[in-house]
Design a protein with these regions (language model features):
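Short, solvent-exposed loop/turn segments at the edges of extracellular beta-sandwich modules
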Residues: 120-127, 236-243, 555-562, 722-748, ...
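Surface-exposed, short loops/turns at beta-strand junctions within beta-sandwich domains
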Residues: 104-111, 220-226, 539-545, 704-710
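Extracytosolic secretory-pathway proteins
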Residues: 258-479, 595, 774-791, 795-800
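N-terminal non-catalytic regions of secreted/periplasmic and cell-surface proteins
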Residues: 24-78, 109-114, 118, 125-194, ...
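Aromatic sugar-binding surface patches on proteins
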Residues: 94-101, 210-216, 430, 529-535, ...
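Bacterial N-terminal signal peptides that target proteins for export
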Residues: 1-11
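Short beta-strand segments enriched for Tyr within beta-sheet-rich domains
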Residues: 63, 111-120, 179, 226-232, ...
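C-terminal motif of bacterial Sec signal peptides marking the signal peptidase cleavage site
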Residues: 19-22
Length: 800
């Protein structure tokens, strides 16, 4: 943590926050007393104009007077007027607040909403928003169709926080950029494609990037009165390769002076002192805003259930700009490296079945300076109305238990807290709400609503001081985990992962990581997610070769002064390939089944996909599967794929990987036409989308969600039997091939020769609604038949 100087300005700060005229922030004229004033809204989450709101977020309101009648007066609609059904409102704090959730699941991502009040009554009259409907916008989807991951096909910068107008650009500001679509973060390099400069000189800064967001945190305070320029270069790309509109842009601001600053120490009191599951204590302290356990983060996920929560605790050291200079919009900062500690969680599958894993303490580390502002109340001008608080922070979640840390460790970028601040006696009390959406095992986005409550210590001169971080970070675990040097649980295209005990400084890692193959340097890219370093070799891991992954003590944590990492290395090798190469086969196809079917046996309109070629006449027929609207097509292959052989078709009948809409009749059923003794179906149009080619996996993501009930098919091309094979099959789009040049085998029941290809694999499916279930893709580990030839060869693991 940066060194913090305590200034004797806290009493003056408290007077300013209380709204006294000495700070220039109070209004003249008689004071309205609450009992005589009309009823007003004091707080809303989301606030008016808020962006990147989680689709799972509730609406939270707080009022000047408690409700006296029914609470069914909140109306929510999309910007085009479509109403959103709401569940029964939940009164909070004796009717001084409401919590309202959608009745039918989450809101739509990337959508603008309007919130109105109609019929909410208090003893002081009806409640309404003073400036008409409140509007907010949900965040983009992190998964699903490509069209849900962006507002536009052209890449644009939507906003920069602070903007220098409504939110002043300070000498301690951290810049947070938000774009109109997900980014290709590999195109972001600080000092090249993106930079912050003063008089043409690059400002040393930490860059964090994830999804549609980028954070630039200067390593040292900026110089007040100096102009700083943000430059975005033409090489920045969106996730589908879209270039930045206009070929780049520049914006500049003059840094304003925050000095002399005041340090306010706030405690984060526990909801309960109960040692086991404190957030579930029925007698625990509750948030004024939500009625839920204060300072607890309940994690709601299908994989984990909704009954677990972690309780946050710790001291927060907040630096405030000199408030007499900023009486209306008052900037503040929480330094990079600050830490909150969460309580232990006992992991349960689906919230019911114990997984035998406990997280230990969960650490929330600030990866950059958190930037915040105390703002005038947007709904009320009377002095008793609390001030609004907005805080933007980038944090890492890590777990004390290495087993849990490998699954939990991740970065949460640009988390926004929105709350109220009010002076209560000698304390400044803040209640705020924020949403965290951590990934669970990389399979599901969980939802957690943080009901934050902090209180300043009444005697700031004797408040706790920051505890210096003197612990050296260390390597907790790696993937792969090698036994006797043999890494039997990974495949050639897998990434390498190093999980550390705490988050590391990304700049320090640049010269600290190394990867060698057979003693020679192996090129790689790397990324940092929480306390996990993900290493991706440029070439897939080569079976049989020895690799060494190492980190040196050049890597450090985020403390000031920084603590170097304990050096560590791991050596491993994949099982060697034995014997001659054979044709690759399909391990899984989603949706559908990994076999070419007898087209004389299928009746797609009736939901009958026929039986596998080479099978018996009395074999079961396969069903026509359904694919939920937000899921991709995913295919896994037994051997490394030759990327040059995979071509996505953009018209009917083109490409070696085809995704097509099927021609249908007036009832929406696919139309069959005779083809000798078989039936064939016609393409209506190619489905536009993006095909991701990995070492052994093909994933197709459509531009738009699959339509409910619509008929689709996807086809993997190959060439049947040796007689039909041509030398250019693997480069002409005729067949999907392995790196060894063997064509895809799709009909194993026909007993083909080991090096033969197979017939085209055509799988029909119907679009279906989004489901709440979680799709878990499982890999077949090469524990025995490493070369995937269907035999246990002498020399393979366990058989040599």
């Amino acid at each position: 943590m940066r060194s913090i100087r305590f200034a004797p300005l806290f009493p003056l700060m408290m007077l300013c926050l209380a709204g006294l005229t000495a700070c220039g922030g109070a209004e003249e004229g008689p004071t309205n007393h609450l009992g005589a004033a009309p009823a007003e809204v004091f707080y809303s989450y989301p606030y008016d104009g808020q962006r990147r709101v989680s689709p799972a977020s509730p609406v939270v309101l707080r009022f000047s007077h408690p409700l006296t009648g029914g609470a069914d007066g909140v109306r929510l609609s999309e910007a085009d007027g479509n109403s959103v059904a709401l569940a029964a409102p939940e009164p909070v704090d004796g009717g001084l607040g409401l919590l309202v959730r959608p009745a039918q699941g989450d809101l739509r991502p990337g959508t603008r909403y309007r919130l109105t009040l109609d019929g909410l009554e208090t003893e002081a009259g009806p409640l309404a928003f003073p400036d008409g409907p409140l509007t907010f916008e949900t965040r983009l989807a992190s998964g699903g169709a490509n069209g849900q991951r962006g507002f536009d096909t052209v890449l644009r910068l939507r906003e920069v926080l602070p903007d220098g107008e409504d939110l002043p650009f300070m000498d301690f500001s951290t810049l947070r950029l938000r774009f109109n679509q997900m980014l290709d973060t590999d195109t972001l390099t600080y000092g090249e494609s993106i930079s912050l400069t003063r008089d043409g000189e690059l400002v040393p800064a930490i860059m964090l990037a994830k999804g549609d967001a980028v954070t630039l945190d200067p390593r040292q305070d900026l110089r007040p009165g100096e102009r700083y320029t943000l430059t975005l270069g033409p090489s920045i790309r969106g996730f589908q390769g879209a270039a930045l509109a206009g070929g780049g842009l520049q914006r500049s601001w003059v840094a304003r002076d925050s000095r002399p600053r005041t340090v306010m120490v706030q405690e984060t009191p526990p909801a309960s002192g109960r040692g086991d599951d404190p957030c579930a204590d029925p007698d625990g302290r509750r948030s004024r805003l939500t009625g839920q356990a204060m300072n607890c983060v309940p994690i709601e996920a299908v994989l984990l259930g909704d009954g677990d929560a972690t309780q946050q605790s710790g001291n927060v050291f907040t630096e405030l700009a000199f408030l007499p200079h900023y009486p209306d919009v008052s900037p503040l900062r929480i330094p990079r490296g600050s830490l909150l500690t969460g309580s232990n969680v006992k992991v349960k599958v689906a919230g019911a079945v114990p997984a035998g894993i406990e997280t230990g303490d969960i650490a929330v580390t600030f990866l950059s300076d958190a930037s915040g502002y105390l703002l005038p109340n947007p709904f009320s001008r009377r002095p008793e109305a609390p001030r609004q608080v907005r805080l933007f922070m980038d944090v890492a979640m890590t777990a004390e238990n290495p087993e849990a840390n490998g699954a939990l460790s991740q970065t949460l970028l640009q988390v926004e807290l929105v709350g109220v601040a009010k002076v209560e006696g000698p304390r400044l009390v803040i209640d705020a709400l924020g949403v965290v959406e951590p990934e669970v095992l990389g399979q599901e986005t969980a939802f957690g609503l943080l009901s934050l409550h902090t209180e300043s210590y009444p005697d700031q001169n004797n408040a706790p001081a920051p505890i210096p971080d003197t612990r050296a970070p260390f390597l907790q675990s790696t993937m792969p985990m090698a036994e006797d040097g043999l890494a039997a649980t990974v495949q050639p295209g897998d990434a390498l992962v190093m999980n550390f005990s705490e988050p590391l400084d990304p700049e320090s890692l640049e010269q600290a990581l190394s990867l060698t193959r057979e003693g020679a340097d192996e090129p790689f890219d790397w990324s940092l997610d929480g306390a996990s370093v993900v290493v991706r070799p440029h070439q897939p891991l080569r079976p049989g070769d020895s690799y060494t992954l190492a980190v040196s003590d050049r890597a450090t944590d985020l403390a000031e002064p920084a603590n170097p990492v304990q050096p560590a290395s791991r050596t491993f090798r994949l099982p060697a390939l034995i014997g001659d190469p054979v044709a690759p086969v399909l391990i899984t196809t989603y949706p559908g089944f990994p076999c070419a079917v007898d087209k004389a046996s299928w009746h797609i309109a009736e939901g009958d996909h026929g039986r596998c070629r080479g099978g018996r006449a009395d074999d079961d027929h396969l069903p026509v599967p359904a694919l939920p609207a937000d899921r991709p097509i995913r295919v896994t292959v037994s051997q490394d794929i030759d990327p040059a052989s995979v071509r996505l078709g953009d018209t009917c009948g083109s490409g070696s990987f085809r995704v097509e809409r099927v021609a249908v009749d007036g009832d929406g059923n696919p139309v069959a036409s005779p083809d000798g003794d078989k039936r064939k179906y016609q393409c209506d149009a190619a489905v536009p989308g993006r095909l991701k080619v990995e070492a052994r996996t093909l994933t197709f993501i459509p531009d738009q969600p699959w339509e409910d009930g619509a008929a689709y098919r996807y086809t993997l091309q190959s060439v049947n039997r040796a007689s039909g094979q041509q030398p250019d099959d693997c480069v002409s789009g005729e067949a999907i091939c392995s790196q060894a040049g063997k064509r895809l085998q799709t009909a194993l029941l026909e007993g083909p020769e080991p090096d033969w290809g197979g017939p085209d694999l055509e799988i029909h499916f119907r679009g279906a609604p989004v489901t709440d279930s979680v799709f878990q893709a499982l890999n077949n580990l090469p524990t025995a038949d490493v070369n995937a030839n269907g035999f246990f060869d002498d020399g393979e693991p366990g058989y040599g």
